[in-house]
Design a protein with these regions (language model features):
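Catalytic-loop region of hydrolases
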Residues: 2-66
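N-terminal cap/lid subdomain of alpha/beta-hydrolase-fold enzymes
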Residues: 49-140, 147
Length: 150
């Protein structure tokens, strides 16, 4: 198991996110002072597109660990974790603008948020026959998404 985690960790550090996925600014959020990426990865042999966000470490992105975050369910958007729990910005109840989250996990790690399964959050599932999900096909899609981005 440790070997697998080591390979995944090395792959995460050596991966170059597509420049087209780089986020340079967001409305109603403080300036971005770290690598922030948002994009899609296709699931092979389907029309599904899984949305991801990657918040690179604010400390040392080339040597800090990677955390892959999936909100519970399956069926709950991982953007809730990004926006209200441990992401680089937070939007508290009743607020209309994001604030910098001083306790963000990306202070010391590269955090990869996965919107799973397809059809949840910003993920796309245009063929409704592919949208029914259970633990097994969600796990398969999650693995494909992680392998595609790392």
């Amino acid at each position: 198991m440790l070997r697998i985690l080591s390979v995944v960790g090395f792959a995460a550090l050596s991966y170059a996110y597509p420049t087209s996925d780089l986020v340079t600014s967001l409305d109603q959020q403080p300036d971005i002072s770290f690598g922030l990426y948002s994009g899609y990865v296709g699931i092979p042999n389907t029309q599904k597109q899984i949305h991801y966000m990657a918040a690179l470490s604010q400390r040392n992105p080339t040597s800090d660990p990677i955390i892959i975050w999936f909100n519970g369910g399956p069926g709950c958007s991982s953007m809730l974790g990004w926006a209200q729990e441990h992401g680089p910005y937070s939007l508290d109840d009743g607020q209309t603008q994001f604030a910098k989250n001083e306790y963000s996990w990306n202070n010391e790690a590269n955090v990869f948020y996965v919107e799973s399964p397809a059809g949840v959050g910003f993920s796309i599932c245009p063929d409704k026959s592919e949208c029914a999900f259970d633990d097994n096909n969600s796990a398969d899609d999650n693995l494909q998404a992680v392998l595609a981005i790392l």
